[in-house]
Structures are given as structure tokens and as C-alpha cells.
């Protein structure tokens, strides 16, 4: 009986020990200091810990003032008053932390000493600009985090251009609690200047070196630049030839030469102010040459989709990309050949395609061959292309037609975005001009121009306005003989929502066909209630017609959901088409240009 009673009494004590001592902590501190203390004091971190008992709590109460003083000093408060009280009278112990931070310590003076930076008459390093960029100015609150960040930023500004061996040789912050001032001194030694040497390539087996060399804009003798290395590496990653790319300065060569230099210094030879040219090392792992992939999907524009693609990275020293795509409203087979980027930065390609479309009562069958030259950067892309297109058209309620054409087109795209994948500020503009102006393989001569743009205007981090527009015009003696590919229609996910894909255009028989002119516009408001989730309201309007006077805009409006997925922004919209008086679901991934 006595043993049973002991077991009953011991059970709650064992449970209590397993859970740890439960107590309350209340922190009274101004501003954000309460969050600082709550996130770092042992009193808070070890609350409920199975190993925490009353004696350990008392010890943490005794050490809490010193710990709080250390934490407050990181925010510039070096003379705080911290009072910690433990009340054990209740069922659960209560700890109260009262903090009076006092006046913060301010930056009193800043002394920056820059050593090295060997004189270069051609392009001397701007030491005054480096000093002026120091962010921790006199009179600011001296915070430990800001102090460390300022030193890292200054060192980073030096090592990423010209002087990758730079280092801080002195870093002192002298704090006077009486005057509430911090005296700062930083000394930085640049080390020797570095320039790039010849390129060294490792890892190539199947593909020609020209793929890498033609993308390299770093010349022997150029000053070291981390940004140049990253840009070169990014270009190589985008080629599709490599599964892994690393572009660096060959420091192994540098170390060997430095060891030789140190041996000379020990013999009384002075150290050089600059390093010998450092080889540019490119290490790659090649992608497999051939790749076959299958895909299925669905589009609210063209319905269910099945596709098979075949890529070959080295056929006649060219890259082949081919695909067969079968959708409910569109079927297409194409093969494109890509030349390696030239030394002048040109990307040349040619190919051919067979395509069948069944859109709004109009069935078109096209065969085309084409060639293209593109150049530029993601900020400014340009291209010129030529295409021979042979097309037959069957229209419900009208006779069939045949057309062929050989147009040339110049296109340019301007981008100024804060983020290329998830833009929240900036714009993209695209314009094209071209046509078939010679009577060669062309049934009807024409001139065609288009312009489209999208603008992102943030109101604040959670609220965003998006404006989109597109216009197009085609000039010809007659529309007959002009392939429908070059005419204009509107409606669909990335056009006027609330209408079917290319539903808006010119009525011909029982079908909707393309017109000579196009005008669409859209305004959208987005609210991001979470970092990756948002909602939208929008209003779209537009139409296509054979004359400007016949463009009577059709409107659509509705609500949508937005999601920032790993592959890009996903948009799901429900739009009401005012002219057709019914709602339609739209789904799109990202934006189209």
C-alpha cells in the first residue's frame, strides 16, 4: 500500500520533470527592443526545456541583466538599466524584465585608411568614391550589425573589381559610454591589381570550343571583374549545351606564381604592385547530346495538349530542336537548327514547320521555312527574319483560299524590369515592322507593323497595377492573297479575357477571320496577401477589323488568382465577356514577351 502511494505521488513529479519548469516571462522595453530580448534571452529560449528546473531558472535570472546589456549594445545602447525580478509566490513562477535603454551611442568620427591601390594612369581606382560610399555616417546610431555590414560592403566593392586579394588589416570601434560616441577606424589593403589572361577550357568532349569562345567578352589584359565572370557564366548556362558551368580566375596558377615571387622577395627582390595576368578558367560538364521528352497539358485557349520533342546538340555542328504538338484546336510539327553564337554576338537559326489550326470556323493549313538572325541582351533584343509561307484556308460558309508569301521582318524588344521572372516594376515593349514587298513567291504584297507593351507600377509592396496594350496594322491592295497568319484577331488568355481564343475579328460566312487592324488594352490591379499568393481584378477591351472605323472594342472583366510558382507566375481568371454575356475560365503561365 505504501509503495502504491509513493508511485501515485511520484507520477506527477516525473511528468513535471519531463515537461520542464513552466514559467511566464514579461519583457517591458521600448520599440523593437522587446523583440530583440525575447528572441535571444536564455530566460525565453529555455522556457519549457525538460532540463530546466527552479534552480536553473534562478541562475538565468541572475545572469539575465548581463546578457541583456550585451544584446542592447548591439543596437547602440551601452548604458541601459536592466531590472529582472522573479516572483515564486504563484502557481507558476513569473519573471519580469524591465529595461530603460538610455541614450544610444552615436557615430562620432570615421577614419578610413586605404593602402595599396597601385597607381594606374589609364584608369586609377577612385578611392574618394569608395570612402564616400561608407554608409555609417557621423551622427548615426552605432549598431553592431550596421558596423559589420559597412565593413563587408566596402571590402566587397574592392574585391569584386581589380583587387580580389584585398583585405581589412584593421577594424576598431572605440565606444565611450560617457560621451555616447563611437570612434571608428578601418584600414584596408588592396593587394596587387589583377588582370585576366588567356582563356582555359576544361570539360569539353563533344562540342566545339567556339561555343564557349564566341560568348567570351573578356579579353586578355582586362581588369578583374566578378560581374564579368558571372555574366559569362550565365551566358554559357543559357546555351543548353552544359549541365554545369563554372567560370573563375585560375587562382591555382596565381598561387604558384606568388610562391615564386615570395622566394624572390626573400632574396631581396621587392614585391610587384600588380599580378601577372591570371588565366580565365572555364570548367563545364556537357549535357547529353540527344534528348527525347514527352508532355501533356491543357490550355484554355487551345484545349488539351500532347507533345513529343527531340533535341540533338551536335548534328552537323548545329543544335536541332524539333517537336510535334497536338492540341484540340492546333497541331504543329517543327524542326529548327541553331548555329553557335558568333564572335560578334549573332544567334543564327533556320527551320521549317507544318501547322493546322481550327479556330472559330476557319481551318488553315500552312507549310513554312524560315531563317532568323538575333542579337542583343535581355534588356535590348533585336532580330531580322525571312519566312516563306504557303497556306490553304477553308472557311465555313465560304469558298476555300490559297495564299503564299515571302515577308521579311525586323523586331526589337526593350526590357526594363526589376525581376525578369516575377516583375513588379518596369516595362517591356516590343515592336515589329516588315512585309512582303517584292513580287517573289508572294501572291499579294503587304506591309505589316505591330507594337505591344506591358507596364508594372507598384503602389506598395502588396499592391500592384499592370497595364497592357497591343496594336497592329497591315497595308495591302487586297486582303485576298495575304496569309491569315499575318492578319489580326483578338480574344483569349493574353488578349481580351472573357472571349474564346481569337474569337474577335471579322465575320466571313459562319467564321471569324483576321482583320487588317488590331487594338487591345488591359488594366489589372493585384493584391498580394501572402508573398506567393495574390488576387486580381481586371478590365480588358479590344477588337480586330478591316478598317479603323470598324474597330468596336469588346470588353471583358473579372477576378483572378495569382501564384508565384517555381516555374513562373501562374494566373487563373474568371472573366465575363460583355458582348457574349457569359463567363469564361482563363489560365496562363507568365507573360508572353
What are these language model-derived features?
Residues 58-59, 141-145, 161, 173-175, ...:
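Outer-membrane beta-barrel domain signature
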Residues 123-124, 227-430, 447, 494-498, ...:
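Gram-negative/organellar outer-membrane beta-barrel architecture
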Residues 542, 546-568, 579:
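C-terminal structured "cap/appendage" subdomains that terminate the fold
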Residues 18-32, 36, 45-300, 304, ...:
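Periplasmic polypeptide-binding modules associated with outer-membrane biogenesis and secretion
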Residues 238, 394, 398-401, 405-529, ...:
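C-terminal outer-membrane beta-barrel translocator/porin domains of Gram-negative envelope proteins
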Residues 13-17:
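Sec/Tat signal peptide C-region and signal peptidase I cleavage site
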Residues 105, 120, 160, 165, ...:
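Short beta-strands and strand-coil junctions in structured, solvent-facing domains, enriched
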Residues 1-5:
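Bacterial N-terminal signal peptides that target proteins for export
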Amino acid at each position: 500500500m505504501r509503495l502504491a502511494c509513493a508511485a501515485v505521488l511520484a507520477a506527477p513529479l516525473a511528468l513535471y520533470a519531463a515537461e520542464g519548469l513552466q514559467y511566464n516571462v514579461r519583457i517591458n522595453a521600448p520599440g523593437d527592443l522587446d523583440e530583440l530580448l525575447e528572441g535571444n534571452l536564455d530566460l525565453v529560449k529555455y522556457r519549457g526545456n525538460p532540463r530546466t528546473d527552479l534552480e536553473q531558472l534562478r541562475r538565468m535570472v541572475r545572469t539575465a541583466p548581463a546578457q541583456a546589456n550585451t544584446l542592447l549594445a548591439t543596437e547602440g545602447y551601452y548604458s541601459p538599466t536592466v531590472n529582472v525580478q522573479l516572483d515564486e509566490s504563484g502557481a507558476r513562477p513569473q519573471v519580469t524584465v524591465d529595461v530603460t535603454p538610455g541614450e544610444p551611442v552615436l557615430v562620432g568620427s570615421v577614419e578610413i585608411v586605404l593602402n595599396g591601390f597601385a597607381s594606374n594612369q589609364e584608369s586609377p581606382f577612385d578611392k574618394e568614391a569608395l570612402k564616400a560610399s561608407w554608409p555609417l555616417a557621423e551622427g548615426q546610431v552605432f549598431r553592431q550589425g550596421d558596423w559589420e555590414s559597412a565593413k563587408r560592403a566596402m571590402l566587397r566593392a574592392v574585391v569584386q573589381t581589380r583587387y580580389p586579394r584585398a583585405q581589412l588589416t584593421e577594424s576598431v570601434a572605440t565606444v565611450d559610454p560617457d560621451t555616447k560616441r563611437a570612434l571608428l577606424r578601418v584600414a584596408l589593403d588592396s593587394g596587387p591589381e589583377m588582370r585576366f589572361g588567356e582563356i582555359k577550357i576544361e570539360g569539353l568532349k563533344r562540342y566545339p570550343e567556339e561555343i564557349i569562345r564566341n560568348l567570351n567578352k573578356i579579353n586578355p589584359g582586362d581588369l578583374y571583374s566578378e560581374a564579368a565572370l558571372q555574366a559569362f557564366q550565365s551566358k554559357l548556362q543559357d546555351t543548353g549545351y552544359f549541365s554545369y558551368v563554372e567560370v573563375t580566375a585560375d587562382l591555382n596558377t596565381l598561387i604558384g606564381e606568388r610562391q615564386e615571387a615570395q622566394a624572390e622577395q626573400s632574396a631581396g627582390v621587392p614585391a610587384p604592385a600588380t599580378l601577372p595576368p591570371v588565366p580565365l578558367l572555364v570548367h563545364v560538364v556537357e549535357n547529353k547530346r540527344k534528348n527525347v521528352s514527352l508532355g501533356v497539358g491543357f490550355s484554355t485557349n487551345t484545349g488539351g495538349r500532347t507533345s513529343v520533342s527531340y533535341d540533338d546538340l551536335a548534328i552537323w555542328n548545329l543544335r536541332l530542336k524539333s517537336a510535334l504538338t497536338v492540341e484540340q484546336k492546333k497541331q504543329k510539327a517543327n524542326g529548327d537548327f541553331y548555329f553557335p553564337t558568333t564572335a560578334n554576338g549573332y544567334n543564327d537559326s533556320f527551320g521549317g514547320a507544318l501547322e493546322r489550326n481550327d479556330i472559330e470556323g476557319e481551318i488553315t493549313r500552312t507549310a513554312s521555312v524560315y531563317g532568323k538572325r538575333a542579337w542583343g541582351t535581355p534588356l535590348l533584343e533585336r532580330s531580322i527574319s525571312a519566312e516563306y509561307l504557303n497556306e490553304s484556308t477553308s472557311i465555313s460558309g465560304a469558298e476555300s483560299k490559297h495564299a503564299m508569301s515571302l515577308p521579311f521582318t525586323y523586331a526589337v524588344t526593350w526590357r526594363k524590369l526589376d525581376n525578369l521572372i516575377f516583375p513588379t516594376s518596369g516595362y517591356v515593349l516590343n515592336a515589329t515592322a516588315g512585309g512582303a514587298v517584292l513580287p517573289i513567291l508572294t501572291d499579294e504584297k503587304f506591309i505589316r507593323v505591330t507594337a505591344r507593351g506591358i507596364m508594372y507600377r507598384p503602389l506598395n509592396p502588396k499592391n500592384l497595377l499592370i497595364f497592357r496594350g497591343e496594336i497592329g496594322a497591315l497595308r495591302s491592295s487586297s486582303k485576298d492573297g495575304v496569309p491569315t497568319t499575318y492578319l489580326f484577331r483578338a480574344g483569349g488568355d493574353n488578349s481580351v479575357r472573357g472571349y474564346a481564343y481569337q474569337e474577335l475579328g471579322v465575320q466571313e460566312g459562319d467564321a471569324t477571320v483576321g482583320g487588317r487592324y488590331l487594338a487591345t488594352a488591359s488594366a489589372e490591379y493585384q493584391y498580394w496577401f501572402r508573398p506567393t499568393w495574390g488576387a486580381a481584378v481586371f478590365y480588358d477591351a479590344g477588337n480586330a477589323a478591316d478598317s479603323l472605323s470598324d474597330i468596336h472594342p469588346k470588353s471583358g472583366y473579372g477576378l483572378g488568382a495569382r501564384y508565384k510558382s517555381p516555374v513562373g507566375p501562374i494566373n487563373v481568371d474568371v472573366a465575363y465577356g460583355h458582348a457574349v454575356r457569359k463567363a469564361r475560365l482563363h489560365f496562363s503561365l507568365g507573360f508572353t514577351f
